[in-house]
Amino acid sequence: MQNLKFLIAAVSCLGPALAAPTPTSNFINSNFNKRASVEDSAFGYASLNGGTTGGAGGTTTTVSSYAEFTAAVQGDDPKIVIVSGPIEETAEQVDVGSNTSILGADSSAVLTGFGLRLKEVENVIIRNLGIAKVLADNGDAIGAEYSNNIWIDHVDVSSDRDHDKDYYDGLLDFKRGSDYITVSNSFIHDHWKASLVGHSNSNEDEDSGKLHVTYANNYWYNLNSRAPSIRFGTGHIYNNYYETVSDGINTRIGAQVLVEGNVFVDSKKALYSTDEGYAVERNNDFGDAKNEALEGTLTSVEYEYDLLDTSEVKSAVVGTAGQTLTF
């Protein structure tokens, strides 16, 4: 297995790299194929700004109904909420408090008909959880605004494409100055508008200098657009596997994105700019698509990460991304 490990100097995310990447051969990703622990550490941008620990050290509650779930995730005291089995309710997003870990016990932990809202909170972990078919009137599957330090890992988020593009809203949307977010090892599929970073061209005052988001080791499948779409922010997108995606990575309105080690199959637009968004791309396999983005300046990030060669991405991601953990 040929792998690259990057130890990056702590430099400005919008500036040029001050240190060249150092190749090594000791790739280890502890998130793959194992029983998970509440002590697992966030990586990517969620590891910065003091890190993201969720409800570590707090009380643990197991829930199996909508009423139990909504009660358990409230408040800002440290808490771990384990979802046991499916919960179905057509309702608006449930507000999640700070210092919270929401963990699906196994692959049956699926929320259907309602999503999660992270508003003016910090330090939230969501892992091994399924969220499906949240109607547009009820918000996103997972949405964050005015919030920071969020780790979304091994989730399965979807709707369908049988309805028009406005029947559902976003799957993973981050806006209004949210910051230090990682989306990893997740299955993002069967949807029109997958993941939006920065909701409006006119929101520069709130978003500029924020919206740092890592997307790592995710499986994007059967999507129309926003995989992801980033305005104003800073994105690091690596080792993702894209299959049957019409519009992939869209960098917009001054965004700076580092795109590396991703694979695109049966996809139309892999990487492109709108309104002067920028990208640096390295070692990607775009298949029949291509890079149509303006050249950017984001050549390094402020954390350590492991990078797979594109020949290894499919086997590492497909079948592993999504709800493949147990708690």
Swiss-Prot record:
GO terms for biological process: cell wall organization; pectin catabolic process. It is an enzyme of class 4 (lyase). Residues 1-19 form the signal peptide. It catalyses: Eliminative cleavage of (1->4)-alpha-D-galacturonan to give oligosaccharides with 4-deoxy-alpha-D-galact-4-enuronosyl groups at their non-reducing ends. Keywords: Calcium, Carbohydrate metabolism, Cell wall biogenesis/degradation, Glycoprotein, Lyase, Metal-binding, Polysaccharide degradation, Secreted, Signal. SUPFAM superfamilies: Pectin lyase-like (SSF51126). Its cofactor is Ca(2+). It comes from the Eukaryota. Belongs to the polysaccharide lyase 1 family. This is Pectate lyase A.
